[in-house]
Curated annotation (Swiss-Prot):
Gene Ontology MF term list: transferase activity
UniProt entry tagged with the keyword Chaperone: no
Protein name as it appears in the record: Nodulation protein H
Gene that this polypeptide is encoded by: nodH
Function in brief: Required for the formation of sulfated nod factor. Proposed to transfer activated sulfate (PAPS) to a N-acetylglucosamine of the nod factor.
Organism: Rhizobium meliloti (strain 1021) (Ensifer meliloti)
EC number(s) from the headed UniProt entry: 2.8.2.-
Region (Hydrophobic): 1-17
Keywords on record: Nodulation, Plasmid, Transferase
Superkingdom of origin organism: Bacteria
Length: 247
């Protein structure tokens, strides 16, 4: 692989699961100088041909991500990144500290306003084993799911703790928050914000993405015990996750 004199500037997309990071990455990768290589810590991510990389030390794995990344023949890469989801940090506890110490790293933290939507989507994907849906896919939406009280509470707390941990760990100049809802509503200006933050040249993206949302129905149609959950979490810090558009 041919590199420029200076190594590409590194970035990482961090998020809870099911927050639109695949879509964001797809759009960012339309830029001829930006390359995001998928989930670094995911054994099955096809962007990384070598599963053995996960046997490397944390430092060596980051070198693999930012210095010895898989080649991409049609790009002159000036900014290179990867994605990491919160559960993957749990599986590799020492990795977060090594990531925060990487010189010059910029972080894009993607947040979904309604964490219940994130959990519901995560459970649906695990149960159906369907993690992505493409625009050409006309299959039926996934079946509704049951979500135990304890599972919801643990997930809500994990999301709060993770977001706080990331914000606390990085200087404000090195982190940019992106809302899932804004990304869906206004993808082009949202990606322009990301590119400006990274320092990549401005580019009018075509939004030729091939991904689509797997689930568009409201929560009361996709979570079988939604109303029981709503009562359980009423008047608490997570009550807002159970508000419906027609309330």
């Amino acid at each position: 692989m041919t590199h420029s004199t200076l190594p590409p500037q590194p970035f990482a997309i961090l998020a809870m699961p099911r927050t639109g990071t695949h879509y964001l990455e797809e759009l960012v990768n339309e830029h001829p100088n930006v390359l995001s290589n998928g989930e670094l810590l995911n054994t099955y991510d096809t962007n990384w041909p070598d599963k053995e990389r996960l046997l490397l030390s944390d430092r060596e794995l980051l070198e693999r991500a930012f210095l010895r990344y898989p080649p991409h023949s049609d790009k002159k890469v000036t900014h290179v990144g990867c994605k990491i989801n919160e559960p993957q940090f749990q599986e590799r506890p020492s990795f977060f500290a090594e990531l925060t110490a990487w010189p010059g790293l910029k972080v894009i933290l993607v947040i979904r306003r309604n964490t219940l939507e994130s959990l519901r989507s995560f459970v649906q994907a695990r149960q159906t084993r369907q993690w992505l849906k493409f625009k050409s896919d006309s299959s039926a939406p996934p079946p509704p799911v049951m979500l135990p009280f304890a599972t919801c509470e643990a997930y809500f707390k994990a999301a709060d703790d993770f977001h706080a941990r990331v914000v606390y760990a990085f200087d404000s100049s090195r982190i940019r928050l992106i809302e899932y809802e804004r990304l869906l509503r206004d993808p082009v200006p949202c990606v322009a914000t990301v590119l400006d933050f990274l320092g990549a040249p401005a580019l009018q993206l075509a939004d030729r993405g091939i991904l689509r949302r797997q689930e568009t129905r409201p929560l009361d149609q996709t979570v079988r015990n939604f109303h029981e959950l709503r009562v359980h979490f009423a008047n608490g810090p997570y009550a807002r996750f159970f508000e419906l558009a027609n309330d």
